[in-house]
Amino acid sequence: MAYPLQYGLQDATSPIMEELLHFHDHTLMIVFLISFLVLYVIFAMLSTKLTHTSTMDAQEVETIWTILPAVILVLIALPSLRILYMMDEIYNPALTVKTMGHQWYWSYEYTDYEDLNFDSYMIPTTELKPGELRLLEVDNRVVLPMELPIRMLVSSEDVLHSWAVPSLGLKTDTIPGRLNQATLSSTRPGLFYGQCSEICGSNHSFMPIVLEMVPLKQFESWSATMI
């Protein structure tokens, strides 16, 4: 989860998020290099008295500033496309969960089980227990097994929503009449928080998401009690 005054991304909990963190660092270094180069050129132009008003043509310089940006764009695009295709790949999911967005709560259905579904509402501030997080706790958490590929099918019953869990690198739009899918896999147990990330009305801020990633045996025990 995020902390006050945190300027970086959340700690990665999935392979996809780890790739996104590496891509973020890779791109940020390129941006820094470009920024330093531009600032150096500006400083050099302002601080020197030498001018080249007679220069009308410089083929070498034009070639460099045409090829160099193209190379930089390729260096950014290739890892980006790789991650994009990785996010679309789903290999034999061990579990499928369908989530529907509503104004203003989420409903979940474990499609591999005959009757395992529930609604998930935010717990009001007045009902929070000591240690619980304001605007992030829900009455029913989404319990999932860790270290297994899980497919999420997302849609909406009313307006546009967005099902997002930053530490897992997930953000999928929920669109009425359309079924989108995403894949997730957690490398460690714990509670992972998210929220609706598409403005959907007056209570948009009150649609938290809580994933509880547990070992497989614990998930099987939980699912047996819920059926």
UniProtKB/Swiss-Prot annotation:
Catalysed reactions, as listed in the record: 4 Fe(II)-[cytochrome c] + O2 + 8 H(+)(in) = 4 Fe(III)-[cytochrome c] + 2 H2O + 4 H(+)(out)
Q: Does the keyword Hydrolase apply?
A: no
Question: Keywords assigned by UniProt?
Answer: Copper, Electron transport, Magnesium, Membrane, Metal-binding, Mitochondrion, Mitochondrion inner membrane, Respiratory chain, Translocase, Transmembrane, Transmembrane helix, Transport
Q: Which BP terms does GO give this entry?
A: ATP synthesis coupled electron transport
Key word Transmembrane present in the record?
A: yes
InterPro entries with a match to the protein in the record: CcO_II, CcO_II-like_C, CcO_II_C, Copper_CuA, Cupredoxin, Cyt_c_oxidase_su2, Cyt_c_oxidase_su2_TM_dom, Cyt_c_oxidase_su2_TM_sf
Q: What is its EC number?
A: 7.1.1.9
Where it sits in the cell: the answer is: Mitochondrion inner membrane
Q: Where is Mg(2+) bound in this sequence?
A: E198
Pfam families noted in UniProt: COX2, COX2_TM
TM spans (from-to) = 15-45, 60-87
User: Which class of enzymes does this protein belong to?
Assistant: translocase
PROSITE patterns attached to this UniProt entry: COX2, COX2_CUA, COX2_TM
Q: How is the cofactor bound?
A: Binds a dinuclear copper A center per subunit.
Q: Which residues lie on this side of the membrane: Mitochondrial matrix?
A: 46-59
Predominant place of localization:
mitochondrion
Topological domain ranges for the Mitochondrial intermembrane compartment: 1-14, 88-227
What's the subunit arrangement here? Component of the cytochrome c oxidase (complex IV, CIV), a multisubunit enzyme composed of 14 subunits. The complex is composed of a catalytic core of 3 subunits MT-CO1, MT-CO2 and MT-CO3, encoded in the mitochondrial DNA, and 11 supernumerary subunits COX4I, COX5A, COX5B, COX6A, COX6B, COX6C, COX7A, COX7B, COX7C, COX8 and NDUFA4, which are encoded in the nuclear genome.
- Protein name as catalogued: Cytochrome c oxidase subunit 2
Q: What is the scientific name of the source organism?
A: Tachyoryctes splendens
Lineage of this protein's species? Eukaryota, Metazoa, Chordata, Craniata, Vertebrata
